[in-house]
A protein has these predicted regions:
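Short alpha-helix at the nucleotide-sugar/activated-sugar donor binding site of glycosyltransferases
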Residues: 228
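Nucleotide-sugar donor-binding catalytic core of glycosyltransferases
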Residues: 2-222, 233-250, 271-298
């Protein structure tokens, strides 16, 4: 699988947008964890860079998966030909769903689950996560690694002996991530680390209480959903996407600005995290949780 990037201007910033070559050859799901391709695999109909469908075939309560980049085309040529009420999911994209897209909502859409929902959710549209990196990239979404580390954690009594992990690719979102590194590099609370393999990263992640999760390509980061599997609290900067997830119950420690970090002790962070104390971390990274939420919207 070859993956390329192009620069895209969005809300005053340049962001990396992925372009893939041969995207339809290998599209496995990531169950028991959540990922875009797990969601795609569950859908009754798919409209993305690999395939389309006959709109007249959509029946009541069917699930239609649309690649977010193609929403304009989908609503212009496909949605209007669908006669039944259905559930829409948009995913597998670096593009956000903004308030402008609500113009597409009508009575045929029972509910819309949108990745990178950049306005407050409501009874008609709600967020769905990026989840783990899609397994097809054969890099950070290797399910075997997550399962092996989870099994190891259950028997490791030294879990959570470390404090705050800082480990990410600065160049994924340089304007957001580079300043964060500069702010914490001289603070002993933060372990700035690089890893030689995904397994090593996950194994170490499972020992930390917190992890810094700056935005990746447009608002969100796979790192959030990786950390929840191991009951590690993601520290994120406030934005609408993160707030939507927090309001849904996802355990996040949201701060207004990264500059606040150096004014907080570890005990301060632990106290702030009391808001998440009784939450089930892992479930928000599982396919089971999101599948049940989607199914609950059927008529």
């Amino acid at each position: 699988m070859k993956k390329y990037f192009k620069k895209s201007w969005y809300k005053g910033k340049y962001r990396n947008i992925s372009i893939e070559k041969y995207p339809g050859l290998y599209r496995p799901g990531s169950s028991p964890y959540f990922s875009g391709d797990t969601l795609r695999k569950y859908a009754d109909f798919i409209f993305d860079e690999t395939q389309s469908f006959k709109p007249r075939n959509v029946k009541k309560n069917n699930i239609v998966f649309v690649k977010t980049d193609l929403l304009e085309i989908y609503f212009s040529y496909y949605h209007k030909k669908i006669d039944s009420e259905y559930i829409l999911v948009s995913h597998n994209s670096d593009s956000a769903v903004t308030k402008a897209e609500t113009k597409f909502l009508d009575d045929k859409i029972i509910h819309w689950f949108a990745m990178k929902l950049d306005f407050p959710s409501n009874e008609k549209i709600s967020p769905i996560p990026s989840g783990l990196e899609n397994k097809r990239f054969l890099t950070n979404g290797k399910i075997k690694n997550f399962k092996e580390v989870e099994k190891k954690v259950r028997t490791d009594f030294e879990k959570y002996d470390k404090k705050i992990l800082c480990s990410f690719n600065v160049h994924t979102n340089f304007n957001e991530r580079k300043p964060l590194i500069e702010k914490v590099k001289n603070n002993n609370l933060y372990d700035i680390r690089k890893f030689t393999s995904n397994y090593e990263y996950l194994s170490e992640l499972s020992k930390y209480k917190f992890i810094l999760c700056p935005e990746g390509n447009n608002f969100e980061s796979h790192r959030i959903w990786e950390s929840l599997i191991f009951n590690c609290t993601p520290i994120v900067r406030s934005n609408t996407v993160n707030t939507n997830f927090f309001n849904l119950g996802v355990p996040l420690l949201i701060i207004d600005d990264w500059s606040y970090l150096n004014g907080l002790t570890f005990d301060d962070l632990v106290n702030l995290n009391q808001i998440n104390i009784n939450k089930e971390y892992r479930k928000f990274s599982t396919w089971k949780y999101w599948k049940e939420l989607i199914d609950s919207k059927t008529l």
